[in-house]
């Protein structure tokens, strides 16, 4: 892997003399107070501006400020006109546009395509403060305001839509976001390196159209430049020329080949022979090789080609060996440079050590921003995830190589949070990242890591080259909880339990000191079919971890419970799989509080399965095995009903399905049955989805969540089966006795 220029080695821009601002300005008045006559760079974002390293606009803004640039923020502008996009004036260098920390469509719509009633990234949690496809709208308004100013597109929405992608909300393949956004260049993934490099080059007078060699960027060009070797991957199932089958009954002396051999003339002198070049171009280095994907027009009309393109894209994600990609859109090409080089520990410390205020901008007054409230007292210790779950975008966006901060940097941030953030009570709500326990876990050999093309380091089993030592993380936990003024360090990030069982010492440390009653883990399913499509470990690994968790909890004298996450309707899931999951849930005393159906997000491997019915984890052909897909609303409701098998509202649907599946034996009023024969009046039943507002009650076994909200579970009656008395009351009610009283239905 080629070395990258360290972020702190660039010369500072002349405006460094102004020094860091208390907050990056959001108005002309703030610019005047700072003594600025203009901004060099203006960041437009769909989120409220929170000056905290968990928010993208703060990290990019502070990093550019540290390079000497004057950076302004336009947060959640009114997109109905260009006026809000002009309130800070014309930027000297460029507009940086991002939809926010989430894809704007996922932020606004549920997996069932219903409009959400709130937005966690807006003051007061109000919905409707950003448009659908915000990256497109903001980019177009910036160009409308100042047509000659470069627009640089970034953020997770743009990153995952950089290629022709399936759009769940329109149920079609859309072209690259670059073709619709009128942006000049797109930065994908963690964009610190790319944005600093481009800002420096634009400041030196280079045209944005000439910047085509920065890793982690995508842009439009007409043709492949000279000196590049192009690999054609636009088709699949391309057999070579097949030789004619020889008839074994024909006398070889009668064939034309023999006649030619006998009449062959003088042999060519070997001294006069010349080497013939068979390849159109000699093989060049990977740095000068580009893979041509099927065009937008082809993948739009051919789901199998779409799956093939998705497979090639994911095979080219390791920064150590990835090649450039190109995809034709009409008369032009969209070109994708290889992914950015991961940041070193020193660079991570540099980025997270900026002078963040760690609070929302004062312009929001006392209005609370739910996303900030959730991470207010948390610390991010690393980036990246090598799990490779096919339904998740973290690996695609942050990369498979873990980027770690040093212990000193993390401890300094905890101390700063303790001393600066109002309301700190001594409890750090999370010390983690995309995954709680991948800190400093990496391949044993940098050379192997550089050449690896596996989509996951832990599926189908933990790679023998992966160093699963958790000692550095254990040491960090001990240092953090020893700090004066820190009472408790909680771990709220999702735990990769298949890694944790490799280190019993880590599990003991975690369970003894860092669990606040509940610990989130994500088995996602119990059946092998969907788990293989998700690239998740078998349920047996969960059982091993559960044994460890309960053992160490008992030794610590603590009442603690696991909160497992499950997904309904994921590609590869059959009705029988969901039935078996429901039986497992009942057998283990779990009752789902919230239910999440699979959400096809742009560019995810599972989304390619959903759209194409093929499995991109293996070589894709027109004849390759298909994947079971759950698309109809009725079947999605059924799969969610299996997860909430205890909810009377879903019982009619479950009875019908069980009879159709030949499993009517599961309908009855005994403990071994899944659904009862009676149907109580559920008119007063309240949905558990009510805005995630019910506070958590006392700790009880049997809770589980199937939405990855990060919020605490709500109180319920736990996972206890109905008592005989409850069953008798419900049966009597169903038969018409005691009509004046509702049965006590556990929720």
From Swiss-Prot:
Domain of life: Bacteria
Disordered: region residues: 670-747
Protein name per the record: UPF0313 protein PA4928
Binding-site list for [4Fe-4S] cluster: 385, 389, 392
Entries under PANTHER family matching the protein: UPF0313 PROTEIN YGIQ (PTHR32331:SF0)
HAMAP family: UPF0313
A Pfam cross-reference name: DUF3362
Family statement: Belongs to the UPF0313 family.
Organism of derivation: Pseudomonas aeruginosa (strain ATCC 15692 / DSM 22644 / CIP 104116 / JCM 14847 / LMG 12228 / 1C / PRS 101 / PAO1)
GO function terms (MF aspect): 4 iron, 4 sulfur cluster binding; catalytic activity; iron ion binding
Keyword set, alphabetical order: 4Fe-4S, Iron, Iron-sulfur, Metal-binding, S-adenosyl-L-methionine
Record NCBIfam families: SAM_YgiQ (TIGR03904)
């Amino acid at each position: 892997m080629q070395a990258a220029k360290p972020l702190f080695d660039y010369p500072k821009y002349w405006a460094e003399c102004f020094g860091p601002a208390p907050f990056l300005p959001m108005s002309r008045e703030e610019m005047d107070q700072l003594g600025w006559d203009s901004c060099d760079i203006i960041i437009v974002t769909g989120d409220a501006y929170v000056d905290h390293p968990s928010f993208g606009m703060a990290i990019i803004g502070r990093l550019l400020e540290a390079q000497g640039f004057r950076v302004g923020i336009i947060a959640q502008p009114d997109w109905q006109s260009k006026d809000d996009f002009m309130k800070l004036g014309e930027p000297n260098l460029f507009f940086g546009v991002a939809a926010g920390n989430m894809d704007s469509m996922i932020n606004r719509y549920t997996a069932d395509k219903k409009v959400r009633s709130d937005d966690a990234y807006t003051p007061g949690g109000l919905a409707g403060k950003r448009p659908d496809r915000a990256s497109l709208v903001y980019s177009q308004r910036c160009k409308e305001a100042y047509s000659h100013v470069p627009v640089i597109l970034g953020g997770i929405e743009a990153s995952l839509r950089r290629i022709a992608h399936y759009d769940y909300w329109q149920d079609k393949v859309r072209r690259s976001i670059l073709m619709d956004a009128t942006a000049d260049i797109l930065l994908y993934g963690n964009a610190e390196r790319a944005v600093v490099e481009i800002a420096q080059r634009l400041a030196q007078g280079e045209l944005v159209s000439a910047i085509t060699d920065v890793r982690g960027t995508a842009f439009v060009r007409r043709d492949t430049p000279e000196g590049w070797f192009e690999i054609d991957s636009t088709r699949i199932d391309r057999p070579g020329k097949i030789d004619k089958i020889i008839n074994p009954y024909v006398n070889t002396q009668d064939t034309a080949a023999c006649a030619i051999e006998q009449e062959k003339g003088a042999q060519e002198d070997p001294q006069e022979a010349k080497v013939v070049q068979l390849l159109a171009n000699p093989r060049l280095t990977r740095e000068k090789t580009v893979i041509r994907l099927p065009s937008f027009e082809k993948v739009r009309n051919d789901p199998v080609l779409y799956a093939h393109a998705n497979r090639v894209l994911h095979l080219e994600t390791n920064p150590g060996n990835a090649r450039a990609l190109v995809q034709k859109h009409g008369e032009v090409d969209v070109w994708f440079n290889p992914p950015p080089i991961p940041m070193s520990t020193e660079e991570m410390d540099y980025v997270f050590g900026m002078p963040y205020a760690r609070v929302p901008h004062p312009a929001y007054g006392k209005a609370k921003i739910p996303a900030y409230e959730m991470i207010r007292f948390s610390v991010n210790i690393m980036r990246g995830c090598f799990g490779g779950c096919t339904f998740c975008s973290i690996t695609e966006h942050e990369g498979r190589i873990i980027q770690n901060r040093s212990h000193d940097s993390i401890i300094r941030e905890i101390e700063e949070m303790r001393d600066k953030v109002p309301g700190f009570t001594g409890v750090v709500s999370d010390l983690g990242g995309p995954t709680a326990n991948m800190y400093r876990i990496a391949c044993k050999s940098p050379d192997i890591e550089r050449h690896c093309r596996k989509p996951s380091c832990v599926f189908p089993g933990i790679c023998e080259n992966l160093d699963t030592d958790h000692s550095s993380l254990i040491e960090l936990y001990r240092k953090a909880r020893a700090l004066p003024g820190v009472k408790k360090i909680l771990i709220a990030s999702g735990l990769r339990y298949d890694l944790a069982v490799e280190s019993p010492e880590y599990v003991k440390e975690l369970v003894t000191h860092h669990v606040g009653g509940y610990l989130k883990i994500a088995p996602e399913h119990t059946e092998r079919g969907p788990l293989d499509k998700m690239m998740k470990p078998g349920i047996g690994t969960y059982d091993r971890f559960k044994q460890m968790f309960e053992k160490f909890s008992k030794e610590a004298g603590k009442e603690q419970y696991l909160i497992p996450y499950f997904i309904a309707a994921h590609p590869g899931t059959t009705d029988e799989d969901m039935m078996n999951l429901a039986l497992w849930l009942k057998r283990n005393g779990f009752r789902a509080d919230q239910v999440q159906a699979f959400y096809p997000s742009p560019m995810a491997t599972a989304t390619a399965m959903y759209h194409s019915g093929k499995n991109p984890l293996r070589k894709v052909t027109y004849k390759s095995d298909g994947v079971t897909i759950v698309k109809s609303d009725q079947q999605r409701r059924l799969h969610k009903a299996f997860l909430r098998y205890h909810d009377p509202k879903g019982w009619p649907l479950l009875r019908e399905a069980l009879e159709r599946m030949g499993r009517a034996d599961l309908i009855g009023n005994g403990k071994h049955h899944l659904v009862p024969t009676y149907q109580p009046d559920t008119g007063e039943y309240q949905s558990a989805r009510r805005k995630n507002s019910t506070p958590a009650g006392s700790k009880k076994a049997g809770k589980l969540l199937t939405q990855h909200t990060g919020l605490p579970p709500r109180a319920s009656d736990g996972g206890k089966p109905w008592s005989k008395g409850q069953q008798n009351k419900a049966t009597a009610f169903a038969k018409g006795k005691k009509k004046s009283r509702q049965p006590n239905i556990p929720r």
